Amino acid sequence: MNKMDRQRIETVGKLGSTYGIRGWLRIYSSTENAESIFDYQPWFLKIKDQWQAIELETWKHHNHELIVKLKNINDRETAQTLANVEIGVDLSVFPALEEGDFYWHDLIGCQVVNLQGYAMGTVSEMMETGSNDVLVVRANAKDAFGKQERLIPFLYEQVVKRVDLTTKTIEVDWDAGF
């Protein structure tokens, strides 16, 4: 396993518990379509806070779950050492997006400001709902409205007016009192 610079790696899933005695592991994908995790190669595993390259040998469906066989992981005991380890891929494997589309990892950490110039906080995570994605904004410590968190729908052009990834700023048409 080769080590990789952590700055360029994005987590796309996690290995779960072992399956069987031949080194198979359950996998939990955080990609929009669970099987899409296999489109992004090579994989890196986060072991002891270091990203290390590993080769996927094969995968399959089993009882509504996905299971994987990693190269050179041939028994249950070795596989067990990888249980609950994060799976990452180099950001360069993600396709370029169209205007107005953004990867969640690019939005997390951005400062959110409304049209009146009020600093609403920092995007701490993204949430998927049935109709649209939602910015989870952790409010600044001395928020004038006493907010700790704001949920702002990510509706580009309607609510989200501008995203500047260079300055890590998102401008929204949203009342600071909400």
UniProtKB/Swiss-Prot annotation:
Function field: An accessory protein needed during the final step in the assembly of 30S ribosomal subunit, possibly for assembly of the head region. Essential for efficient processing of 16S rRNA. May be needed both before and after RbfA during the maturation of 16S rRNA. It has affinity for free ribosomal 30S subunits but not for 70S ribosomes.
InterPro entries to which the protein is assigned, alphabetical: PRC_barrel-like_sf (IPR011033), PRC_RimM (IPR056792), RimM (IPR011961), RimM_N (IPR002676), RimM_N_sf (IPR036976), Transl_B-barrel_sf (IPR009000)
Domain-related comment: The PRC barrel domain binds ribosomal protein uS19.
Keywords for this protein: Chaperone, Cytoplasm, Ribosome biogenesis, rRNA processing
Underlying gene: rimM
Protein's name in the database: Ribosome maturation factor RimM
Molecular functions (GO terms): ribosome binding
Localization terms from the record: Cytoplasm
Keyword Cytoplasm: yes
Domain PRC barrel: 99-178
GO cellular component: cytoplasm; ribosome
Entry's Gene Ontology BP terms: ribosomal small subunit biogenesis; rRNA processing
Family membership noted in the UniProt record: Belongs to the RimM family.
SUBUNIT field: Binds ribosomal protein uS19.
Primary site of residence: cytoplasm
One Pfam family linked to the record: PRC_RimM
